[in-house]
Amino acid sequence: LSLEQISQKTELSRYAAQVLLEASLTIGTVLVKDDQYILAKAGWFLLNDEMAQVNMNFNQDVNYKGLFHLEEALLNGRPEGLKELGNWPTIYEGLSDLPGQAQKSWFGFDHFYSDNSFDQALEIVFSHSPRTLLDVGGNTGRWATKCVQYNEKVEVTIMDLPQQLEMMKQKTEKMVGHERIHGHGVNLLDEKVPFPKGFDAIWMSQFLDCFSEKEVISILSRAAQSMSAEGRLYIMETFWDRQKFETAAYCLTQISIYFTAMANGNSKMYHSDDMTRCIQESGLEIEEIYDNLGLGHSIVKCKLK
């Protein structure tokens, strides 16, 4: 299309269209030949690739304004950018009340990466035929729903903030197997809160990266205290040092900045050595690690020492 045609179709002035096209031309998202603008391969992917859209929406709707407070967050150890979205100690207390587009983009980002690993994760977890599973930080119940549909006997309890459990009930009430999904409302930042006992498997997906090392050790220690010798703990995370591609490691370390400025001010995407140390300090030992699940997840399978 010509500049004039693009201006007409977008209802932008000729000046506005030209400014955007020239910027797009120099970053490689469009090409121009004989005064006709053509979408480049990079531009096509920006418009059509789900991962690109999820990442851009997350940064635009959740992070953009808050990142102006990054230095403040680094100095204070608090998510100083979160005030751009609402007044909560961490973003997790506010998930159910985030502004509409921010909430949609946050969950879109969170679900996109975990969903791509769930099918492989189900095979790993259910190879030991658990009949009871504790889903820690289960959010809206996507993993729990996968579990009860994968195995017709398993009972799943989601352990999360009470407001998250309300969202979970709304999301799962019409799903097959919802009657085998239960809730256990707690604030896991309270070190006095114990884990419920009697579960064959404990599951933590994209959960421990939401906490500082000290908090991770506290959570894992309480999990260990609730486990039997036969029980197993499964930690699914995207460890930046265990990625197949250097670009993936780069992206993950940049996501740590979101945790600093927006989420809680003190957590990050972890190096697997740091997580291993936390696991060992919690009275657990690693039985096996499964890498390259989905788009870059690993599952760390743990048992009591």
Role assignments for model-derived ranges:
Residues A17-R131:
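Conserved Class I S-adenosyl-L-methionine-dependent methyltransferase catalytic core
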